[in-house]
From Swiss-Prot:
Homotrimer. Interacts with ARHGAP9, BAIAP2L1, BTK, CACNB3, CACNB4, CRK, DLG2, DNMBP, DOCK4, EPS8L3, FGR, FYB1, FYN, HCK, ITK, ITSN2, KALRN, LYN, MACC1, MIA, MPP4, MYO15A, NCF1, NCK1, NCK2, NCKIPSD, OSTF1, PIK3R1, PSTPIP1, RIMBP3C, SAMSN1, SH3GL3, SH3PXD2B, SH3PXD2A, SH3RF2, SKAP2, SNX33, SNX9, SORBS3, SPTA1, SRC, SRGAP1, SRGAP2, SRGAP3, TEC, TJP3 and YES1. The soluble form derives from the membrane form by proteolytic processing. The membrane-bound form undergoes two successive intramembrane proteolytic cleavages. The first one is processed by ADAM10 producing an N-terminal fragment, which lacks the receptor-binding extracellular domain. This ADAM10-processed FasL (FasL APL) remnant form is still membrane anchored and further processed by SPPL2A that liberates the FasL intracellular domain (FasL ICD). FasL shedding by ADAM10 is a prerequisite for subsequent intramembrane cleavage by SPPL2A in T-cells. N-glycosylated. Glycosylation enhances apoptotic activity. Pfam families: TNF. GO terms for biological process: apoptotic process; apoptotic signaling pathway; cell-cell signaling; cellular response to type II interferon; endosomal lumen acidification; extrinsic apoptotic signaling pathway; extrinsic apoptotic signaling pathway via death domain receptors; inflammatory cell apoptotic process. InterPro entries: FASL (IPR028326), TNF (IPR006053), TNF_CS (IPR021184), TNF_dom (IPR006052), Tumour_necrosis_fac-like_dom (IPR008983). Keywords: Apoptosis, Cell membrane, Cytokine, Cytoplasmic vesicle, Disulfide bond, Glycoprotein, Lysosome, Membrane, Nucleus, Repressor, Secreted, Signal-anchor, Transcription, Transcription regulation, Transmembrane, Transmembrane helix, Ubl conjugation. The chain crosses the membrane at residues 81-102. It comes from Homo sapiens (Human). One of its GO terms (molecular function) is death receptor binding. Residues 43-70 have a biased composition (Pro residues). It is linked to Autoimmune lymphoproliferative syndrome 1B: A disorder of apoptosis that manifests in early childhood and results in the accumulation of autoreactive lymphocytes. It is characterized by non-malignant lymphadenopathy with hepatosplenomegaly, and autoimmune hemolytic anemia, thrombocytopenia and neutropenia. This is Tumor necrosis factor ligand superfamily member 6.
Amino acid sequence: MQQPFNYPYPQIYWVDSSASSPWAPPGTVLPCPTSVPRRPGQRRPPPPPPPPPLPPPPPPPPLPPLPLPPLKKRGNHSTGLCLLVMFFMVLVALVGLGLGMFQLFHLQKELAELRESTSQMHTASSLEKQIGHPSPPPEKKELRKVAHLTGKSNSRSMPLEWEDTYGIVLLSGVKYKKGGLVINETGLYFVYSKVYFRGQSCNNLPLSHKVYMRNSKYPQDLVMMEGKMMSYCTTGQMWARSSYLGAVFNLTSADHLYVNVSELSLVNFEESQTFFGLYKL
């Protein structure tokens, strides 16, 4: 059989191991020739092309994200802190409740003791009344020394006379006698007086208003306060002016206080406009 000589690769021969060979024992494999002798005029076949380069290996897959232990620790820490705060709040509430219960119990106990002592005193007083023992007299309250007198329209002479019975007058611990206030206890007193002057036509007469004191220890009247007015209105026109006096004095028993004015006809005796008074400090 004729073999083709234009085959690009060397021929391979297989040896049957079952056939006997005069050059080798049975079961021996003979080597295959690496090349076939070239005949004259025959070209050597070109070498096979090199194998293509292998592709680069794929990049390794990305690593999975690691857990964040600080966040877990922070969450655990905040949870523990919240629990601790809640515990302290509950503890404070329980302590406050306990203190409130203790105070309530203490108040109830004091109230019971007070009721018991009151009932005992009431029982003792009722027994004394039944036996006939007189109860102690009530303590006398000291009267406040005070006086407030208002103007009296029928006053026609000096010193001024005052209303001591009707209206907004007040007398306590002080006597009123013939236009004057009589002091019956030594001490510091605030003395005051107000006089309201008015007229239909102004003639600018000098006006005076004074408070004076009389006492058997002094040979003459002692002026305590005095007020004067000059050029107080426009000539020929209607006018009105007030004069107020007030000060603190050390008065003794049996002192008599009076009020005097220069023009009695110009005085308005309304109780809210003209008055005289004092009170002990």
